[in-house]
Design a protein with these regions (language model features):
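C-terminal engagement/docking regions of AAA+ P-loop ATPases
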Residues: 4-68, 72, 102, 106, ...
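Alpha-helix capping and helix-coil boundary motifs
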Residues: 89, 230-233
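Conserved P-loop NTPase
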Residues: 214, 218, 224-228
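Walker A/P-loop NTP-binding motif of AAA+ ATPase domains
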Residues: 21-210, 292
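Phosphate/oxyanion-binding loops and surfaces in catalytic or ligand/nucleic-acid-binding neighborhoods
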Residues: 199, 229, 243
Length: 292
């Protein structure tokens, strides 16, 4: 009956993949946090977990984590695309978001996955002149539900651009934690290579390309192209352009913003940027102008 209601509504998707945590390198703290939180989901409603907001550059495993979490915990993973709920008739968008969230409540216990949520909520904090305030009202309905719902629905929302997300969305008590997923470390990249070399049946002894600043998605793409084109990994890597190169400024800005504001997805505690703390060397100024 629940699945039938879901199909008829057309407002939510149902992910049917077979992803697991052991197919996802890194994110140890995030995995442990969510496992522990969901282990308490059968307690009183006031103790039930709310969810997590994941912030990172594209390709770092946020979406794969959300899909894996449902399989790890035995819950269906519902997908909510806020942009697709926008209707042309007056009041239709607001009705759609309310109905979608009611269905999510009815599907409990469940995971509700909102991918790249900033795209659906872009403009929610503006004047509302562009869409007569529709986005702001949809956003208001979502905030109310995040605050007040008592159903056993665990929200996993992902975001690539925090500047486009209204600040009140990420405040305390909307989510159990706001996590930053950084580019993988050397150790994590090695683990990711092992996963995809095995998945695509590649030679594990071959030389690997220079993968400094690569994301997990780029490692997977290189492995897939190596298998597809029947070429070594080093040759397949010539077709990969890392997001850290194409969007270096935005990646650094995102990492700087998250430092001290977000939890680390990799280890317990607050995220601290590996690049934060560099200071531009100041030119010495002498009392005698001739020496300056």
């Amino acid at each position: 009956l629940k699945s039938q209601t879901l199909r008829k509504s057309g407002l939510l998707g149902l992910h049917r993949g077979e992803e697991r945590f052991d197919q996802l390198g890194g994110l140890d703290n995030l995995k442990a946090f969510c496992r522990r939180a969901l282990a308490r989901s059968n307690t009183k409603s006031k103790h039930r977990p709310r969810g997590v907001l994941l912030l990172s550059p594209p390709g770092c495993g946020k979406s794969q984590f959300a899909k894996s979490l449902g399989n790890e915990t035995g819950r269906p993973t519902l997908t909510l695309d806020i942009g697709s709920l926008m209707g042309s008739l007056v009041g239709q968008s607001e009705q759609n978001i309310r109905h979608a969230l009611q269905i999510a409540d009815a599907m409990a216990p469940a995971i509700l996955f909102c991918d790249e949520i900033e795209k659906g909520l872009a403009g929610a904090g503006g004047s509302g002149q562009s869409d007569s305030g529709v986005t702001a009202r949809v956003f208001g309905n979502l905030l109310t539900w995040l605050n007040d719902h008592t159903s056993d629905v665990f929200v996993v929302a992902t975001c690539n651009d925090i500047s486009r997300l209204p600040p009140e969305f990420s405040r305390a008590e909307r989510f159990d934690g706001v996590f930053f997923v950084d580019l993988p470390t050397r150790e994590q990249r090695d683990a990711i290579w092992q996963i995809y070399i095995s998945e695509f049946d590649l030679d594990a002894e071959q030389e690997r390309p220079d993968d400094e600043h690569w994301t997990g998605a780029e490692i997977r793409a290189c492995s897939r192209l190596s298998a597809l084109l029947d070429v070594p990994l080093a040759q397949a890597a010539t077709n990969i352009v890392p997001v850290a190169s194409t969007s270096a400024e935005s990646v650094n800005e995102l990492r700087t913003w998250a430092s001290g504001r977000c939890l680390s997805a990799d280890e317990p505690g607050i995220f601290k940027s590996r690049t934060t703390g560099r200071r531009r060397r100041r030119r010495a100024v002498h009392g005698n102008p001739l020496n300056n």
